[in-house]
């Protein structure tokens, strides 16, 4: 710690910070543009000027840039000094000379860091009366709109896009006061994190194009704290609603998880909530008859009464909804909704993490590891936010080199200059090339079994008591030794694997490496990726596979199916699903999307999406987190009968048993769920209960300046009804209630503090800028390392050796396309590739075909005809298909192709 003196006051700060960060952490306001808590200091904008004095006797001082000046002990500065204030005002003025001053039509208005800083400096008069510099804007794809005339040349965009996120197609061109930030030519931004430009940019140069079509100012939207459902990472988001539609998603700061950034799937994949083909009323018999709520419950009870029911849950539904389904059908008749092989792998992951001697890192903690081995995962496609964390982890080498030279880590340009191209070691063992290969020390591409063999060999190289791998060639043995040496040389090694390739051996190999590292006294970590938002929660919760449920119906053991938020056709072979649905006398589906499964239902109950309901998810880290309802859809349209899955299913159970409804609010079902399973006991601590108040007030979902509430329903009736009442949570559907940053709280619907309207308002909620929330980060961990409970896994697979004329089908994952719900969003659909088949260059040469040629594949009697994509790194004997894309049956993965040839034209 250090003592600094600010305008005559002695204050304790972290001496490792710069003055800007230290003062912001104290709650003091200093305007800035180019600095960002995650990007460090470059001193480009000159906006954060303060007066620094030699000591208490110095009355003259000198102007310094606070972002470039360390907060050393006994530093004397003034923020309110007249010369400093005049300097800061002049900086804003010359930055604004070429700005169009188009706030009324700019989509950043009310959300704009430039507005905040201009007001903060007191600049309120334009003296420049000459021609302004102008630029041509670019078309940057379906996610980002571009308006270069608003640019103030802070360089944040390229520093994030290129330096932080590793993008290569956004740059800066020109010189002096005529620079251009964009692509070489029009085209879609290729980075999976391009959407963060909308928050990183302090002006309106890069804005959310998906929001443009239904635009509202930030102060006119209703928000809630929520959790991204796009993958298992558990990123925190702030969805914004107006007129019963989601309008945009912003990043919600969680110092342990996503911090300041989201991937583009999580930011732009919300469009499925607004689809017009969603079920919004109960639908009977092929969707031809709409029912009231009571009619639907009575009809469902009549259909199920006297039946042998199976309940099929879902890893994209909340724990509460899955628990309500289990209570409806009984524990012995509840099935997880996960395919058998996938369920085996997720259960194995849970066992490994429960028994592992190494802890599970948070997404933030991943950035602090200094040697990483990724085994079998294409992280950019399966856990993109973790991939972004790895990009920061490898840069730790440069920070270490800078520290040895007494250079602070926040001096971004100096650290890069010292580090040059030195990186911490990252080893990637994957099917084929990945988006992280550019920062990897070594990459190896092979079949899943061969990747697992390398993993087992690494464990044996770390500790000789680990099972050895028979028949491994010298090249693979040498690679395994190099990986082991790098992990041993590190202070904090990290092993990452997961379930995406359908291989239990990969997970077991990763577990062996973790055990071996602990035996060598290494303070490392292990992270294992599961496929969906609540896969980990379902593994803890229990329930057999969806395959077992369907077989129970086909065999006649059950004659009724209740499906919760699950499209069975995305899980198992369509023939098996067809057989089960045909055999069932009753099929009831509760879902928020129209799916092939709901099309076969006798009754569809309209379930709430994450925007219309509350619930709890468990991330791959084992962190239980609550998502909260953003809006009440019935307020604007009373005909909408959308409710959380748990509400429908509990009410159905009450109707069947002729009992009153016991769970009248979320806390009731959450507490019951927590009491049902030992490992889920902590979910009650994931968020405050409905009784939580600050100064006696509920928490406001709407900003204080929210306008038009009395007119929103005027087209329906001039009589304004009471606002919706939220009995489930501590939030109100109103601007009435507590908002702001003065009182610490974990669950923050939107970032705002007096004078701070942009995402930089998160500074006011943190214990220190870039740290954790003052009330603690949201969520509670359900898995913590309890010591070494693992035994060696000894089932080392044999080397991959396909029979001549056969190929193994393996999955290629896509950030845009492999996920079910985000793929229903129109902007995301523009980024989804056409279905294809990928083979190695050697295979294509043997077949005599070029990229784009149509290939015919025969797989177990089924024939697919798909365009060819040649993969330079895919191994011989493998055929890759894009997982989750239309026309690619999920049951094909892991099977053998027994016919591969150019299709007849």
UniProtKB/Swiss-Prot annotation:
Annotated GO CC locations: membrane
4Fe-4S Mo/W bis-MGD-type domain segment(s): 221-277
GO process terms (BP): ATP synthesis coupled electron transport
The protein's enzyme class: translocase
Domain 2Fe-2S ferredoxin-type: 1-83
Binding, [4Fe-4S] cluster 2: 151, 154, 157, 201
Alphabetized SUPFAM superfamilies for the sequence: 2Fe-2S ferredoxin-like, 4Fe-4S ferredoxins, ADC-like, Formate dehydrogenase/DMSO reductase, domains 1-3
Cofactor annotation: [2Fe-2S] cluster; [4Fe-4S] cluster
Annotated 4Fe-4S His(Cys)3-ligated-type domain residues: 83-122
InterPro entries: 2Fe-2S_ferredoxin-like_sf, 2Fe-2S_ferredoxin-type, Asp_de-COase-like_dom_sf, Mopterin_OxRdtase, Mopterin_OxRdtase_4Fe-4S_dom, NADH_UbQ_OxRdtase_75kDa_su_CS, NADH_UbQ_OxRdtase_ferredoxin, NADH_UbQ_OxRdtase_Gsu
Molecular-function GO terms, alphabetical: 2 iron, 2 sulfur cluster binding; 4 iron, 4 sulfur cluster binding; metal ion binding; NADH dehydrogenase (ubiquinone) activity; quinone binding
Reaction equations catalysed: a quinone + NADH + 5 H(+)(in) = a quinol + NAD(+) + 4 H(+)(out)
Presence of the UniProt keyword Phosphoprotein in the record: no
Binding site for [4Fe-4S] cluster 3: 228, 231, 235, 263
Top-level taxon of the source organism: Bacteria
Binding site for [2Fe-2S] cluster: 34, 45, 48, 67
PROSITE patterns (alphabetical): 2FE2S_FER_2, 4FE4S_HC3, 4FE4S_MOW_BIS_MGD, COMPLEX1_75K_1, COMPLEX1_75K_2, COMPLEX1_75K_3
Sites where the protein binds [4Fe-4S] cluster 1: 99, 103, 106, 112
Cofactor note: Binds 1 [2Fe-2S] cluster per subunit.
Gene3D superfamilies reported for this sequence: 3.10.20.740, 3.30.200.210, 3.40.50.740
Cited SMART domains: Molybdop_Fe4S4, NADH-G_4Fe-4S_3
Keyword line: 2Fe-2S, 4Fe-4S, Iron, Iron-sulfur, Metal-binding, NAD, Quinone, Translocase, Ubiquinone
PANTHER family on file: NADH-QUINONE OXIDOREDUCTASE SUBUNIT G (PTHR43105:SF10), RESPIRATORY NITRATE REDUCTASE (PTHR43105)
Role summary: NDH-1 shuttles electrons from NADH, via FMN and iron-sulfur (Fe-S) centers, to quinones in the respiratory chain. The immediate electron acceptor for the enzyme in this species is believed to be ubiquinone. Couples the redox reaction to proton translocation (for every two electrons transferred, four hydrogen ions are translocated across the cytoplasmic membrane), and thus conserves the redox energy in a proton gradient.
Family: Belongs to the complex I 75 kDa subunit family.
Protein's recorded name: NADH-quinone oxidoreductase subunit G
Organism: Pseudomonas syringae pv. tomato (strain ATCC BAA-871 / DC3000)
The gene coding this protein: nuoG
């Amino acid at each position: 710690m250090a003592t600094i003196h600010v305008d005559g006051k002695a204050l304790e700060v972290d001496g490792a910070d710069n003055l800007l960060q230290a003062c912001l952490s104290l709650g003091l306001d200093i305007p800035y543009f180019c600095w960002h808590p995650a990007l460090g200091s470059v001193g480009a904008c000159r906006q954060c000027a303060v007066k620094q004095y030699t000591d208490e006797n110095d009355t003259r001082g000198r102007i310094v840039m606070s972002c470039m000046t360390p907060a050393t002990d006994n530093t004397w500065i003034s923020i309110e000094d007249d010369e400093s204030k005049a300097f800061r005002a002049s900086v804003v003025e010359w930055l604004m000379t070429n700005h169009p001053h188009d706030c009324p039509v700019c989509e950043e208005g009310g959300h704009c860091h430039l507005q905040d800083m201009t007001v903060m400096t007191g600049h309120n008069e334009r003296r420049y009366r000459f021609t302004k510099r102008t630029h041509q804007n670019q078309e940057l794809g379906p996610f980002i709109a571009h308006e270069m005339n608003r640019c103030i040349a802070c360089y944040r965009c390229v520093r994030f896009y290129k330096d932080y996120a590793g993008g290569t197609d956004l740059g800066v061109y020109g010189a002096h006061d005529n620079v251009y930030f964009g692509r070489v030519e029009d085209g879609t931004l290729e980075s999976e994190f391009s959407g963060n430009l909308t928050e990183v940019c302090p002006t309106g140069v890069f804005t959310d194009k998906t929001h443009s079509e239904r635009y509202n100012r930030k102060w006119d939207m209703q928000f809630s704290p929520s959790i991204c459902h796009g993958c298992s990472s558990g990123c925190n988001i702030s969805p914004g609603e107006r007129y019963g539609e989601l309008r945009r998603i912003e990043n919600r700061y969680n110092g342990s998880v996503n911090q300041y950034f989201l991937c583009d799937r999580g930011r732009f994949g919300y469009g499925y909530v607004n689809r017009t083909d969603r079920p919004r009323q109960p639908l009977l018999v092929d969707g031809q008859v709409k029912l009231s709520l009571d009619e639907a419950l009575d009809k469902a009870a009549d259909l199920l009464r006297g039946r042998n029911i199976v309940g099929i849950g879902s890893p994209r539904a909340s724990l509460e909804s899955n628990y309500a389904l289990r209570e409806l059908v009984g524990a012995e008749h509840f099935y997880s909704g996960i395919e058998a092989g996938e369920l085996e792998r997720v259960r194995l992951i849970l066992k490994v993490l429960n028994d592992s001697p190494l802890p599970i890192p948070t997404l933030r903690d991943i950035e602090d590891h200094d040697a990483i081995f990724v085994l079998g995962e294409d992280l950019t496609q399966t856990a993109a936010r973790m991939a972004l964390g790895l990009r920061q982890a490898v840069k730790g080498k440069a920070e270490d080199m800078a520290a040895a030279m007494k250079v602070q880590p926040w001096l971004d340009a100096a650290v890069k200059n010292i580090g040059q191209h030195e990186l911490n070691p990252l080893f990637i063992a994957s099917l084929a090339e990945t988006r992280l290969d550019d920062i990897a020390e070594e990459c190896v591409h092979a079949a899943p079994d061969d990747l697992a063999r390398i993993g087992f060999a690494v464990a044996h190289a770390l500790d000789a008591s680990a099972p050895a791998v028979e028949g491994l060639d010298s090249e693979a043995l040498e690679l395994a030794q190099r990986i082991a040496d790098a992990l041993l040389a590190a202070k904090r090694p990290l092993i990452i694997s997961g379930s995406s390739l359908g291989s239990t051996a990969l997970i077991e190999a990763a577990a062996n490496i973790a055990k071996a590292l602990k035996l060598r006294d290494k303070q490392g970590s292990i992270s294992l990726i599961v496929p969906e938002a609540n896969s980990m929660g379902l593994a803890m919760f229990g329930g057999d596979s969806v395959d077992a449920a369907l077989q129970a119906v086909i065999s006649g053991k059950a004659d009724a199916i209740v499906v919760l938020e699950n499209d069975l056709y995305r899980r198992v072979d369509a023939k098996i699903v067809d057989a089960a649905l045909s055999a069932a006398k009753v099929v009831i589906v509760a879902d928020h999307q129209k799916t092939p499964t709901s099309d076969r239902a006798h009754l569809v109950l309209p379930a709430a999406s994450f925007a219309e309901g509350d619930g709890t998810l468990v991330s791959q880290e084992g962190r239980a987190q609550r998502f909260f309802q953003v809006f009440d859809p019935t307020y604007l349209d009373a005909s909408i009968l959308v409710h959380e899955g748990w509400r429908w299913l509990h009410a159905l159970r009450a109707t069947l048993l002729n009992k009153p409804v016991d769970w009248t609010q979320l806390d009731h079902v959450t507490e019951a769920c927590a009491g049902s399973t030992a490992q889920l006991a902590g979910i009650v601590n994931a968020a405050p209960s409905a009784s939580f108040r600050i100064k006696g007030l509920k928490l406001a979902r709407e900003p204080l300046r929210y306008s038009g509430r009395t007119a929103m329903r005027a087209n329906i009736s001039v009589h304004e009804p009471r606002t919706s009442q939220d009995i489930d949570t501590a939030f109100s559907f109103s601007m009435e209630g507590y908002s702001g940053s003065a009182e610490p709280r974990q669950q923050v619907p939107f970032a705002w503090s007096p004078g701070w309207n942009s995402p930089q308002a998160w500074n006011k909620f943190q214990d220190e800028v870039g740290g954790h929330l003052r009330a603690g980060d949201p969520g509670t961990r359900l898995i913590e390392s309890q010591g070494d409970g693992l035994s060696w896994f000894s089932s080392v697979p044999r080397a991959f050796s396909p029979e001549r004329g056969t190929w193994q089908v393996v999955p290629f994952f896509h950030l845009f396309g492999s996920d079910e719900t985000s793929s229903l969003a129109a902007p995301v659909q523009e980024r989804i590739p056409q279905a294809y088949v990928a083979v190695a260059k050697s295979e294509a040469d043997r077949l005599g075909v070029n990229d784009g040629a149509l290939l015919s594949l025969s797989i177990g009697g089924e024939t697919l005809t798909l365009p060819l994509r040649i993969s330079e790194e895919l191994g011989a004997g493998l055929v890759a298909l894009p997982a989750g894309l239309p026309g690619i049956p999920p049951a094909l993965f892991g099977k053998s192709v027994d016919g591969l040839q150019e299709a007849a034209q």
